[in-house]
């Protein structure tokens, strides 16, 4: 029998549970030297051209062709030109002070001798929008191929391939293993058991059929010990996933022209290490039985893991007395049995009298979680879920000001125009990426004076409608800098050395929700017709007994399915919203008797001259849009 269970296999079909399975197939795809590739494509250059992307005097991206000359991001552009005489430097797009649009200035930059071709740091601000735009195009391709995509940064994503691999395994009838053997024939037994329900959820899967061992991996399988490539179902899933990733990466290359590097494994942390293992334009697969070989290959330490590369990772090296080499293996061998051993050691260290808690990044109340994380990370088994939801807490646009680039309130407003344009672009980026409406409700202005004093002012932003409006943001920003400008009478105020605008407190509205989802079930007018009276009645029809009947209280209309009832509920809610916008008629069933007397008392005829009022003709159309058209 396999060492994996039916439960672990079926978990792949759940986006929220797949990462917990030992059969999980997670990919990390990184676009190589992304900014440099974007500029290569924009300028019609080849992959062999040595291109660097420049921001003022600094290099922010180096193409792989330029790296052959020993150029890195640590070099200045002048140093890089000395290493490669035919280097092609390209400056990022920039905003100009007072303008709400960015543009390129090709052929201009700090490396050009002509003063007219210099890009002034004082009057310009870097724009990353061209790279965000290309990132959105790539993300669209990723999402069209995979149902769960997490955008890790502007140039990298995680993919959960669980559903794709599961469907290929169980339902793909066209996939060919060899010229005369299809996947469905090799997997006929497990497919029949699954479709027929002839299995116990906690029982082990059958052994893989001999024929499936001809399944090929796409990419480089990390296998220094020369183990058999396919021995169990986890290898089958990874092999299928590798072929899916190859297809996705080919689409990125064919459609956008960008090369990528990919890592595949059963966890996010390991596949991220794998994507960086071999670059550019490569794909590395780490099988479960090769995890320890991969982690101990000499290229990784505990600080190589995602979230442990900063001060926490460095502190852990000191606290756990880890060696600077083979630190991952050291954790496994020092605490071999369980995470509890590691927790006891951490607790003892934290309680030592010479341990400075004021500067520590280790929470003494969360050592159990940290120990569990380290224990599993060192074994390549620390699973994390993928999240496709936007987690937006704040956005900031700022400028470190030089010279007299912000010497008055007029200069402040000119920079705010740039900030608002940049923030608007980033909000639109989020809205397109997640198909949601994103509305910041709070804006904050922060500035640093000539004497390095910091002043801040924040407050709410009001919009006319539900969409974000840049001019409303600018209006509030101008008000705040004007209020702060009162302090500008002090000689130590201007010129400013820093100015920033931050937006927070986001409302995120899902565009895919229905009217009722958006406003909540405000009109609770529907109930099942089955009540106490029905319980006392008998019926001769068994079909009627089994069929639930749902009824509208206002019109006594009966529905036999929930969908029809919900559509009728939408109609009532739209009608009520329309009456709130355009006014109600006397015949409205949303008004009580008292409300009708209050609102329509002027229309009531006196008792001496009664007449039968003519009923207003009601159209048969109940299109929801008609309720939001103001009556003339």
Curated annotation (Swiss-Prot):
EC number: 2.7.7.7
Variant or mutagenesis effect after changing residue 627 to A: Abolishes POL30-binding
A GO term from the CC aspect: site of double-strand break
Binding-site residues for Zn(2+), renumbered to this chain: 552-553, 568, 572
Keyword DNA damage in annotation: yes
Principal place of residence: nucleus
Domain UmuC: 26-309
Root EC class: transferase
Compartment annotation: Nucleus
GO molecular function, one term: zinc ion binding
Record CDD domains: PolY_Pol_eta
Pfam families: IMS, IMS_C
Region described as POL30-binding: spans on this chain: 625-632
Bias-annotated ranges (Polar residues): 607-626
Region (Disordered): 598-632
Keywords in alphabetical order: DNA damage, DNA repair, DNA replication, DNA synthesis, DNA-binding, DNA-directed DNA polymerase, Magnesium, Metal-binding, Mutator protein, Nucleotidyltransferase, Nucleus, Transferase, Zinc, Zinc-finger
UniProt keyword Cell inner membrane present: no
ZnF (UBZ3-type) residues: 545-580
UniProt xrefs under SUPFAM superfamilies: DNA/RNA polymerases, Lesion bypass DNA polymerase (Y-family), little finger domain
Subunit relationships: Interacts with POL30. This interaction is essential for the polymerase eta function.
Function: DNA polymerase specifically involved in DNA repair. Plays an important role in translesion synthesis, where the normal high fidelity DNA polymerases cannot proceed and DNA synthesis stalls. Plays an important role in the repair of UV-induced pyrimidine dimers. Depending on the context, it inserts the correct base, but causes frequent base transitions and transversions.
Protein name per UniProt: DNA polymerase eta
